[in-house]
Amino acid sequence: MSSPDNSSPSLRIPPWLRVKLPCSHTFADTRALVEGLGLNTVCNSAKCPNMFECFSSGTATFLILGNVCTRNCAFCNITPGHVSPPDPDEPRRVAEAAARLALRHVVVTSVTRDDLDDGGAAHFAATITRLRAALPAATVEVLIPDFRGDHAALRTVMAAAPHIVNHNVETPPAHYARIRPQADYRQSLELLRRVKAAGGVAKSGLMVGLGENDTEVEGVLADLADCGCDIVTIGQYMRPSRQHPPVERYVHPDTFESFAACGRGMGIPFVFSAPLVRSSYNAESAYNALCTLRTEPA
């Protein structure tokens, strides 16, 4: 696959990554609601470039189990360090926020909690249960950590019946030692296989621009197809600060389209691939597209 990408030593942000910030009362109202309930969002904690768009449309991805992580992935803007015990009232407040925002599709993620015996699985399950009670017509998507390969923890989450289980592989395996030193690529693939084996909708994603090449991206897509992944997201890595790894290349939108075509050709039903795509960005649209594909005649 040819890749018409900008990979010069001193990279300038290309025009397709420049985001126009909307001015909206909804943005302020959404942020005030979330903060007023003492909740965190990955949108804010991870400096997501789509935060203004999502908040302005009245959506957010809830970050549970605190905003401090027990791991230190090189690409991530969430602070690593000393964590606090889980807040038992947090699931109720997440459900309240989702109900007050009248969400049709709720996305919940977390920091990685290697300090907890179950990695936070019970807290995820409690949050899913609260959401399904408060918003019975809504779909619930969870973006989970690897739970250190604990199959019982994954079963706890699956028993709460989320509609989508997302776990991101983030980058090709050759780059894990540098980018995700505390994670294991094969362990992540096994988690996704188990989601599918349990009858769930499996979703995963990765970033480009961290030193990988197109062939490696295609290799990840092949692995995710082999796991039975239903939805895959691919987006451009954006350096959160000078303390994070530099962007190695800005991938052209045409190449993102080629990645999507490649993934679909391998049998992945829905591949959402574009520069500003993030794993929870337009998550409702991705899920609806998958449902449409499943109902269309072969």
Curated annotation (Swiss-Prot):
InterPro entries: Aldolase_TIM, Elp3/MiaA/NifB-like_rSAM, Lipoyl_synth, rSAM. The keyword Ubl conjugation does not apply. It catalyses: [[Fe-S] cluster scaffold protein carrying a second [4Fe-4S](2+) cluster] + N(6)-octanoyl-L-lysyl-[protein] + 2 oxidized [2Fe-2S]-[ferredoxin] + 2 S-adenosyl-L-methionine + 4 H(+) = [[Fe-S] cluster scaffold protein] + N(6)-[(R)-dihydrolipoyl]-L-lysyl-[protein] + 4 Fe(3+) + 2 hydrogen sulfide + 2 5'-deoxyadenosine + 2 L-methionine + 2 reduced [2Fe-2S]-[ferredoxin]. Its cofactor is [4Fe-4S] cluster. It is found in: Cytoplasm. Residues 55-269 form the Radical SAM core domain. It is an enzyme of class 2 (transferase). Keywords: 4Fe-4S, Cytoplasm, Iron, Iron-sulfur, Metal-binding, S-adenosyl-L-methionine, Transferase. [4Fe-4S] cluster 2 binds at residues 69, 73, 76. [4Fe-4S] cluster 1 binds at residues 43, 48, 54, 280. This is Lipoyl synthase. It comes from Nitratidesulfovibrio vulgaris (strain ATCC 29579 / DSM 644 / CCUG 34227 / NCIMB 8303 / VKM B-1760 / Hildenborough) (Desulfovibrio vulgaris).
